[in-house]
Amino acid sequence: MGKTPSPGKWIKSLLGKKSSKSSLEKGGEKLRSAKKEELVVKVKDNNVSKLPTEPPVVSSQEVAATQTVVVPDVVIAEKQLSGDIEGDESSNVNLESGNDSEEVKLEEAATKVQAALRAQQAREESQNLKGITRVQAVIRGHLVRRQAVATYSCIWGIVKVQALVRGKKARSSETVAQLQKTNTETETSETLQGSTYSWMENPTKLSMIDKLLVSSPTTLPLKIQYSPEDPNSAKVWLGRWTQLQVWAPGPLVVKNLVPKSQTKKRSFQAVEAEKGKLKRGVRKPTGVSTTANSSTSRSTADNEKPKRTVRKASTLGKELSKIENDKSKQSSRKSTSAIKEGSSVEVKDEKPRISHKKASLSNGIGKATRKSAEKKKEIADAVQKELPIEEVSVSLVDAPEDEKMNLIPVTISKESDLDKDEKSLVLDKPEQDELRTAERDDKAEEELKTAERDDSAEEKIQEPDAQISSENGNVASENTKPSDRRASLPAKIENHHQDDGLTQSGRKIPSYMAPTASAKARIRGQGSPRIAQEKPEKNGTTRRHSLPPAANGKLSTMSPRAHRLLIASAKGSMNSDRSFSSSKDIGDKSTKAEWKR
């Protein structure tokens, strides 16, 4: 649009009126300056000397009309001239004020007209731009579509040309191949290749074959790619393949493979069988053996692999617990009162066990023979080693799962008793000599003690045996606590020892009751007469006791007959439920035999 003039000039140019700046404006400017400043009168030098010394008084316009002022003649003449000029200027000021108000109104009207015109122009321009953008979008869309169609048509033509060229090449290659067949190949090769390439004679029959031939560039046979002299050609390759005779079977290779696989399998099976035998032999629980050879072999096996034996024994304890579960539930309810009374006695005597064992053993050495004293010492050492196992079993049984955990420590203590007793039987002569010297030293120290303390110490030592027997007897009772179980039998055992005290205190072993060489393997059963102590409870059931650890040092209390009955009853209790009744009968017989004595 260019640079627009001011609205006043623009309207004046439209109306045709010119702005005239005459001398009135100049006079107005002088008038304005005169109002602000005082009038200055120019006087010649000659006249200045004649002026009076008194200063002239100049009156302003505000002075009243009644006042009289004395002024010289020259000053009055100048005032008259100035009055004429002021009158002319006042008339000019009135004209200019009227012109200014008209100009302001004209400017306001011009701005309004300009705003309306500019708004209209902006609307028209925006509409034009919208139309232009729409036209451009339409044109571009047409161009893009035309370009896409052109490219598509070009690609389609190229693909058609390629398909035609490939088809011609495929047809020409087929004809060349057929000509070379008839001229160069033998009859065998012709028949072979005729069967393989027969489907290519009429490719137009199948549309899929035609498409494959058109699409794939490498559909030519092997002969066209290589010359007949080339070793990769079809004829030479066929001759080499027939010379190798790949289709013929290799009998030697087959005969060699079969026996190798059989020998491998057989050797693997034999190794597995040997491993299974070894595992079975080691995992068998140690039972009571009648000969010394079997006891030594079991002790060595247990020393080599103790973990496996413990697992097997724990599984046996769990199987026995399932069988005895029903009977133990009935007996546990009725025997809780007696059990709690025995537990208070046990708690008091837990700490001084080890110290009293030494005292009782030294006293027994003075009363019995040297052989019995040696055996007492060995058995006492085994029991002292067993005590930490018992304490561990107490901590394990006090766990929340009482019914599951109480089976494991009993089986461990049972096997440790058997292993340690078997080791004690196989002692060498130098070890026996060392034990004898230690016993003599103990004799000198223990003779100073009184017989009363010895008797009380012996009674206290009998309690661990009773506790171990009660643990082995109450393996399957799941409803009672382990502390109550261990305290169930000591009261009965102490009463029985008081009745039978004469035989156990200081009497020497007769000749017919002395242990022979054949009975050394069974010396484990001589520690505590379990079957003599076994009495029927209130509900009529008998307690089943495990093998005794022989910790009380009493070797002269049982006869060989009662000893054999004890071993038989211990074997029967580990096998099946039928052993319960047999052990009960044997226990009754043994008690009668001891009361007769």
From Swiss-Prot:
It is found in: Nucleus; Nucleus envelope; Cytoplasm, Cytoskeleton; Cell membrane. A motif (Nuclear localization signal 2) lies at residues 356-363. GO terms for cellular component: cytoplasm; cytoskeleton; nuclear envelope; plasma membrane. It comes from the Eukaryota. Pfam families: DUF4005 (PF13178), IQ (PF00612). One of its GO terms (molecular function) is calmodulin binding. Residues 319-329, 414-463, 481-500, 585-597 have a biased composition (Basic and acidic residues). The keyword Nucleus applies. Residues 1-31, 268-379, 407-597 are annotated as: Disordered. A motif (Nuclear localization signal 1) lies at residues 264-271. Residues 467-480, 572-584 have a biased composition (Polar residues). Keywords: Calmodulin-binding, Cell membrane, Cytoplasm, Cytoskeleton, Membrane, Nucleus, Repeat. Residues 106-134, 135-153, 157-183 form the IQ domain. Residues 159-173 are annotated as: Calmodulin-binding. Residues 289-300 have a biased composition (Low complexity). The keyword Cell membrane applies. Belongs to the IQD family. Binds to multiple calmodulin (CaM) in the presence of Ca(2+) and CaM-like proteins. May be involved in cooperative interactions with calmodulins or calmodulin-like proteins. Recruits calmodulin proteins to microtubules, thus being a potential scaffold in cellular signaling and trafficking. May associate with nucleic acids and regulate gene expression at the transcriptional or post-transcriptional level. PANTHER family: IQ-DOMAIN 5-RELATED, PROTEIN IQ-DOMAIN 29. This is Protein IQ-DOMAIN 29. It comes from Arabidopsis thaliana (Mouse-ear cress).
